[in-house]
């Protein structure tokens, strides 16, 4: 293992329980987007707004500069040395829990190395992991070449109007990817 790999492994060991606790906290919000329940600053209803506030609170705790695009998208930045921007995009809204749950879908459980709960995979878990990945830079005093921006959407499951609103009001990132897992399982640590 080289020095960088060792540093990352130590960071993961150090923050892992905080990562899991933050995923658990974010999962606790039943953030099903309902445009009919819109209110100022909460275009997809209060539960989604509350989940967005939770995610932005996690980002602030980790040292990000945060802002809010009128409740459509949360923005968490680690300023870089240049004008370019590398971004991740995740979302804090979920589809309704539906039947088939043997446990409360909004009370995350750890079971035999697995994290179980609505949004753990899609997409609250990846949102938290994305924030902690960027926070590695802050913890180690690394100023990135590009601004690292974590976008936290609120309407991915219904119509993506969050992304359309963002693009109408902000420049496109120079590079964007989603860390959405896309698998039907979420292993705690392998």
Which ranges hold each PLM region?
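Acidic/His- and Gly-rich active-site-bordering loop/insert found
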Residues: 2-118, 144
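Acidic/histidine-rich catalytic neighborhood of metal-dependent amide-processing enzymes
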Residues: 123-189
């Amino acid at each position: 293992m080289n020095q960088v790999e060792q540093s990352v492994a130590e960071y993961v060991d150090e923050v892992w329980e905080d990562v899991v606790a933050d995923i658990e906290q974010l999962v606790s919000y039943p953030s099903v987007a309902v445009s009919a329940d819109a209110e100022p600053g909460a275009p997809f209803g209060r539960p989604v707004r509350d989940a967005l506030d939770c995610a932005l609170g996690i980002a602030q705790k980790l040292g990000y500069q945060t802002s809010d695009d009128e409740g459509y998208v949360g923005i968490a930045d680690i300023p870089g040395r240049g004008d370019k921007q590398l971004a991740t995009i995740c979302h804090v809204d979920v589809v309704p829990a539906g039947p088939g749950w043997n446990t409360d879908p909004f009370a995350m459980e750890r079971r035999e190395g697995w994290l179980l709960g609505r949004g753990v995979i899609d997409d609250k878990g990846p949102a938290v992991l994305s924030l902690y990945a960027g926070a590695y830079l802050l913890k180690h005093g690394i100023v990135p070449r590009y601004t690292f921006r974590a976008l936290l959407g609120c309407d991915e499951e219904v119509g993506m109007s969050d992304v359309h609103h963002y693009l109408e009001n902000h420049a496109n990132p120079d590079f964007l990817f989603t860390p959405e897992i896309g698998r039907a399982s979420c292993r705690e640590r392998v």
